[in-house]
């Protein structure tokens, strides 16, 4: 057996954001999963927030990209470089680093063996002594303080940037789960497409995300908020300002929300009766950034006829759970697909 020290890390390697948990300190890194590169030399210009601020604003020889897509690695070398940057950030105050850290890194529950191997290899290349995968919904459940090690059913719905993870958990394992590549990014795309088709206006990812956060809702609100947005008129090519309503955005998000709700319902249908009874008592717990979409908890509750709760600190649950799982790292040793 190997000891777990204060230098070991839990990493929530997300499509939208990367969080790093250090044992004894909590979350010490919280940055967008974005890297800015020189197109000719492939050298790194910026990582994280600095790189995200460059999206849509870079000169021709610099490109800001997200090396993760739908919860898996889309650009291996860039992901490894980004992870190395964040690992170094997390341990920069450790003085002379006695040894490389063990790293617990989250992966989507629907990932393939090849995709999981890429995450493990990238984590090792980034400076880990060794890397151990933990399924995202399991980490989210730990971070949400659900009784995952007990013989009782817990249900978590983790809505991240690239994937939505739905899982029933009992006795330290996932009983049944579903991973769909529909989540926060898909919501942003739906808003972009709606604005383009309805107003002939092109907006960027950052504007779409701001719209979602400010006036987005899983169902049409009784009193609709308005929001002024700017983009490029596709007819004239010139900048243009329009005003949109919350009801419009809830309509734009309808299909995405419906897909997430169907994933929740289909997972419940595969749940053993005893565990379903536990979930009816305890409720379905929502985690991830998507849990913050207004009225999503209400819509899921109405569709499933079950209580639905939003976890405390939903954005941090996966990272916290990944960090807490370091205490049980021996259970994950050699546990790959």
Swiss-Prot record:
Q: Which GO terms describe its molecular function?
A: ATP binding
Per UniProt, ATP binds at 15-17, 161-163, 209-212, 289-292
- What GO CC annotations are associated with the protein? cytoplasm
| Keywords noted in UniProt | ATP-binding, Cell shape, Cytoplasm, Nucleotide-binding
CDD domains xrefs: ASKHA_NBD_MreB-like (cd10225)
In which domain of life is the source organism classified?
Bacteria
Q: Where in the cell is it found?
A: Cytoplasm
Q: How is its activity regulated?
A: Polymerizes in the presence of millimolar divalent cations in a protein concentration-dependent manner. Polymerization is favored by decreasing pH and inhibited by monovalent salts and low temperatures.
Consequence of gene disruption: Disruption of the gene results in loss of cell width control. Depletion leads to a strong defect in chromosome segregation. It also leads to the formation of enlarged cells, to the loss of mid cell localization of the replication machinery and to growth arrest. Double dynA-mreB deletions have strong cell shape defects.
Tell me the HAMAP family matching this sequence: MreB
What more does the entry say?
B.subtilis has three MreB paralogs: MreB, Mbl and MreBH. All paralogs have the ability to support rod-shaped cell growth normal conditions. The multiplicity of paralogs becomes important under stress conditions. They are probably used to allow cells to maintain proper growth and morphogenesis under changing conditions.
Q: Which family does it belong to?
A: Belongs to the FtsA/MreB family.
Tell me the function of this protein. Forms membrane-associated dynamic filaments that are essential for cell shape determination. Acts by regulating cell wall synthesis and cell elongation, and thus cell shape. A feedback loop between cell geometry and MreB localization may maintain elongated cell shape by targeting cell wall growth to regions of negative cell wall curvature. Filaments rotate around the cell circumference in concert with the cell wall synthesis enzymes. The process is driven by the cell wall synthesis machinery and does not depend on MreB polymerization.
**Under which name does UniProt file this protein?**
Cell shape-determining protein MreB
From which organism does this entry originate? Answer: Bacillus subtilis (strain 168)
């Amino acid at each position: 057996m190997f000891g777990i020290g204060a230098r070991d890390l839990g990493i929530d390697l997300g499509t939208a954001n990367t969080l790093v948990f250090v044992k004894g300190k909590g979350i010490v890194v919280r940055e967008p999963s974005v890297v800015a590169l020189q197109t000719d030399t492939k050298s790194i210009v910026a990582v994280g927030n600095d790189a995200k601020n460059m999206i849509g604003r870079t000169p021709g020889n610099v490109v800001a990209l997200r090396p993760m897509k739908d919860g898996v690695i889309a650009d291996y070398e860039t992901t490894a470089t980004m992870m190395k940057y964040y690992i170094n950030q997390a341990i920069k105050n450790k003085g002379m680093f006695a040894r490389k850290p063990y790293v617990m890194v989250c992966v989507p529950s629907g990932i393939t063996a090849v995709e999981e191997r890429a995450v493990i290899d990238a984590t090792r290349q980034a400076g880990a002594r060794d890397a151990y995968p933990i399924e995202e919904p399991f980490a989210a459940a730990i971070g949400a303080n659900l009784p995952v090690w007990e013989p009782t059913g817990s249900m978590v719905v983790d809505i991240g940037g690239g994937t939505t993870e739905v899982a029933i958990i009992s006795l330290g394992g996932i009983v049944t789960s579903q991973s769909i590549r529909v989540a926060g990014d898909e919501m942003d795309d739906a808003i972009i497409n709606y604005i383009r088709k309805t107003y002939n206006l092109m907006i960027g990812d950052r504007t779409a995300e701001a719209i979602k956060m400010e006036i987005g809702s899983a169902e049409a609100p009784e009193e609709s908020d308005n929001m002024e947005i700017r983009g490029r008129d596709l007819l004239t090519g010139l900048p243009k300002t329009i005003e949109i309503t919350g009801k419009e955005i809830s309509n734009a998000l309808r299909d995405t929300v419906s897909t997430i709700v169907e994933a929740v319902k289909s997972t419940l249908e595969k749940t053993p009766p005893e565990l379903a009874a536990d979930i009816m008592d305890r409720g379905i717990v929502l985690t991830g950034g998507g849990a913050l979409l207004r009225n999503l908890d209400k819509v899921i509750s109405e569709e499933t006829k079950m209580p639905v709760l939003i976890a405390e600190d939903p954005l941090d649950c996966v990272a916290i759970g990944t960090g807490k799982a370091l205490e049980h790292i021996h259970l994950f040793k050699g546990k790959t697909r």
